[in-house]
A protein has these predicted regions:
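N-terminal glycine-/serine-/threonine-rich phosphate-binding loop
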Residues: 1-48
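Active-site-proximal beta-strand elements of phosphoester/diester hydrolases
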Residues: 12-24, 113, 125-128, 145, ...
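Active-site beta-strand/loop signature of hydrolases that rely on acidic residues for catalysis
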Residues: 15, 30, 38-68, 90, ...
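CN hydrolase (nitrilase-like) catalytic-core segments centered on the catalytic cysteine
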Residues: 78-98, 153, 162-279
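Short beta-strand scaffold segments in enzyme catalytic cores
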Residues: 99-101, 113-116, 144, 260-262, ...
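Short, glycine-anchored, charge-dense loop/turn motifs used at functional sites
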Residues: 112, 116-123, 263-270
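A short, polar/charged loop-to-alpha-helix boundary motif
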Residues: 128-142, 277-295
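Cysteine/selenocysteine-centered motifs that mediate thiol-based redox chemistry or coordinate metal-sulfur cofactors
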Residues: 153-177, 181-183, 289-327
Length: 327
């Protein structure tokens, strides 16, 4: 683990997390939404604002695109227009911004990527480790942990990356005090009969006439209740803050459930939104909660010499794409 005490560190950090309904393929509209939220976050004194997975390009419709269509939507990083705009926005408003889109990599390879733009002009990119959205989108092969200007250390894991406990632990062991966790989740098709499942689009379309019905879906087993089965444990067991951002509303043939929230190192929800629409929450992180959090204590009791079998294939591993689309 990287010792935190050796790095200059602000005692508190104000963060913002956003949920919004991305428009498929409409990067201009989606960036305009992002820019409006950045202005609001900066006005409220946030030093970090987190946006959802693939919020610039759109998400679930990607699986139906041809390779040519995907290539027309994807952009290189750091030389593409969305990267440059995000970088300029971070510098203009003196705030760190995280946002996602489809990256055009080398040799015709694509990635589900997330860029963190710092106000000093620096950039960090995370490629989703467990990507499944399109046959041409390949998973990344590196963990991403970075230093924020305020001295805090943050890691990035995209959606399915957070499902695997090993990924969060490895991020924590690299010194992450904050996990930036952009998602497009909730309301998903699944073979599990006890959680998730598709939300009837008519309920979403009638959300103003019947707000109680959509609230029950977003907060129930297809949304927040499912998140509460596992998301707090990622923060608690690894002694870190978790900034969860998500899509909300129509995402091709599914309905995303929002519930943008921030959790502390004890797995407690510091602030969240239950709004059935675009929304942002802002809260302060207290570094004083980190050193004696249960997860930090547990990690100091690790016995690494016992854990070599974790890196040995069992023969039961499958591609995440096969697992996802066999559901």
């Amino acid at each position: 683990m990287i010792p935190r005490k050796h790095r200059p560190h602000a005692r508190t950090l104000r963060v913002a997390t956003v949920q919004f309904e991305s428009q498929p393929g409409d990067k201009e509209s989606n960036f305009a939404t992002l820019e409006a939220f950045v202005r609001k976050a900066a006005y409220q004194g946030a030093r970090l604002v987190v946006f959802p997975e693939c919020c610039i390009t759109g998400y679930w419709f990607l699986r139906n695109l041809t390779r040519k269509q995907l290539a027309g939507l994807a952009e290189p990083i750091p030389d593409g227009p969305s990267t440059r705009r995000l970088q300029a926005l971070a510098q203009q408003h003196d705030i760190t911004i995280g946002a996602g889109w489809v990256e055009a990599g080398r040799a015709g390879v694509f990635h589900n990527s997330y860029v963190v733009a710092l106000p000093d002009g620096r950039l960090h990119r995370h490629r989703k480790l467990h990507a499944f959205e399109h046959p041409a989108i390949e998973g990344g092969a590196e963990f991403t942990v970075l230093d924020l200007p305020e001295g805090w250390r943050a890691g990035v894991l995209i959606c399915y990356d957070c499902n695997l406990i090993e990924n969060v632990r490895l991020t924590a062991l690299q010194g992450a005090e904050i996990l930036i966790a952009p998602h497009q989740t909730g309301g998903c098709r699944t073979r599990n009969p006890h959680l998730m499942g598709v939300i009837d689009r008519r309920i979403w379309e009638r959300r103003r006439e019947d707000p109680g019905a959509i609230r029950r879906e977003l907060r129930g087993e297809k949304g927040r209740a499912w998140l509460m089965r596992w998301l707090p444990s990622r923060a608690h067991d690894n002694g870190l803050f978790l900034v969860f951002s998500n899509g909300v509303g129509v995402d091709d043939d599914e309905i995303r459930t929002g519930n943008a929230m921030v959790l502390d190192p004890y797995g407690r929800v510091l602030k969240e939104t239950s709004r059935a629409g675009d929304a942002m929450v802002v809260t302060d992180l207290d570094a004083g909660l980190l050193p004696d959090s249960t997860g930090q204590v547990w990690m100091r009791a690790r016995r690494p010499e016992l854990y070599a079998p974790l890196a040995v294939p069992t023969g039961r591993e499958q591609s995440v794409r096969k697992l996802k689309f066999s559901e």
